[in-house]
Structure formats: structure tokens, C-alpha cells
Amino acid sequence: MRGIGGRRAEYRPIISVLTDSAKPLDVARAFRDRLGLRECYLADLDAIAGSAPQLETYHAIQSLGVRLWVDAGVRELEDALALDRAAVHTLIVGLETIAGPEALGTICRTLGPAKVLFSLDLKQGYPLGACNHWEGADARTIASEAVALGIRRLLVLDLARVGMGDGTGTVALCRELACRHPELELIAGGGIGNAADLKRLQENGVNAALVASALHNGNLMPEDWRRPWSLAEHAKSAE
């Protein structure tokens, strides 16, 4: 689906210069064959909304030799274990859906910090989630608590920026988090529109980037992330 500003009711099938198909398997194959990407981020919107994860789709994509990062609306350890059994490469635990810090800590301890990526979900800069514990907390506080729980991989994602192509809007936050928590693998996404956005993120302590629309519309090509300053080894693709 083509994400637009986090307004999921307005999401539409992807239109891409890379493939005529909007099916996840075909899109992943195009990322691999046309762009040389070997890792793919997938947001399972139905699972995030409470439906069962689309495990068959995950397996099909992974059969291409593509390592899959999946956000499937993990709430508790049981949800995370189901994705682990599906051999998902990176399990994304989103602030939007996680039951609370206790569940996050349990998942991190059980599966290990290398497997778990905590998504600091924001909307227009404000934390997005149903957890009472973090109600009213700012993004920096939540990130620090996540680190204290064992998180070592953090995604900063402002859903209001998704698909807009005007930058992530989180550069200052990322810079502060990188300074406060140098042990973090810090990833940013939402709104990346061109190579200049990648460069700006790298200059502010970001280790990797999630990109979708800029790949589908041709604004970013492999030569853009293979520049000496780029996030080449970490560039991820998003669906």
C-alpha cells in the first residue's frame, strides 16, 4: 500500500516505476532485482489493526532470499513468539500497539536485543500509542525507558510524514537520541524524499533509513545510497 501521512483510510495500492504489480511478493522481488536490496520492511496493516498476521506472505517474500523486517502489531510476548517462529529476521515492536514497558522488556529479554527493533511511533511529533504507562510522556522519555529495558535498536517514525517526501521531521530528535544513547542502532523513516534527506540523517547520528515512496517514484536509486557519505549498507526498503 502507498502510505499517505499516516491516514490509513486513504492508503491506496502502490504505483511504482519498479513494477506494475502492487502485490507484496512482486514488490519485494522488484526491490531485489531492480535495486539490489536484500532487506525489506513490511507493515502488516491488518495485523496492526488486530487481525492475524499474513504469515504466508512473509514466507513467500523470505523465499526470495530477502530478510524481512515486520511490524505486525505486536502487543504481548505471544505475538512476538509467533513472528519468531515464522523466521522473521527483525521483529518490530511498535509503540502504537505494545501493551506497555513490561511487555517490551519481556520480549527484548526473550528474543534478544539483536532481534527486536522498537518503533518510536509518532504523529506530528507526538508519541502514538494506547499504553497508559506512557500517556503524556514525550518521545525522549519513552526512548530512554526503552533503552533501560534492553532495547538496542530504535526506529524513529513519524507517521504524519509517511509518503509526503518532505523529510522525516525528526532530525533534531534523532541527533539528541544519538548523543544520549550512543549504544543504539538508530533508524529513521517517514518522508525521506531524496539523497539529501539521507545525508542529513547520517550527519545527525542516524545509522539506517527506511525508504518507500522515493523508491517507487524513482527519486532514489542505488547510486544515491552508494555514495561515500550514504547509509548504503543499511538502506532498507519499506512497503
Stretches found by the model and what they are:
Residues C40, L83, F118, L154, ...:
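Conserved, mostly hydrophobic/aromatic
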Residues E39-E56, L155-D166:
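Glycine-rich, proline-tolerant flexible connector loops at the mouths of alpha/beta enzymes
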Residues D20-D33, E76-L81, W134-E145, L198:
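Short, acidic/polar
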Residues A52-H59, N132-T141, D166-R175:
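Charged helix-capping and loop-helix junction motifs
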Residues M1-V17, D84, V88-V162:
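Conserved anion-binding
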Residues A103-L111, L198, Q202-H234, A238:
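C-terminal helical cap(s) of enzyme catalytic domains, especially alpha/beta-barrels
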Residues T57, Q62-V70, P113-L117, D121-C131, ...:
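Short beta-strand/loop segments at the ligand-binding rim of alpha/beta enzyme cores
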Residues L64, L68-L91, A172-V211:
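Catalytic cores of alpha/beta
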